[in-house]
């Protein structure tokens, strides 16, 4: 059950953050030595960057094509992710990220991949504030372990779908809190690549 379906339920109790489903996609792209072809990461890179960033410029990717072991992959993955973040293709989202800043960075990312579409930052900010009130039942303080980032990501994901994009993050055995977007039309292609990696 998604975030906004849950809020339609009649209840006199404060919603529990643990009940909120992640309303965005995650992809497990962890390398398997002897099985995973490095070129698959080039295909992922092209989807994420809309062919605007050449992964072959990363020396660690060249090394992965020569020495395909897990340690080499981790070195490549860290460098690749850093390059994507430095070039505004990936956004870090954690509990300290402001919703307005996150939404603005999403629009910068849309610019980066040559999209003419935008999400409404003011609408998202106001919607987030309204949803947040539902976790402060009868004026009580929000619990210390509240996952603000999950709520932010879910709201932004809903708005992105309206303009044809999906919010995603990658897993390599753990969630690194780094998000990016892809065209909804590319979801099946990315899922197919994921099955080839594993």
Identify the role of each PLM range:
Residues 2-198:
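Contiguous interface-forming segments/domains that mediate binding rather than catalysis
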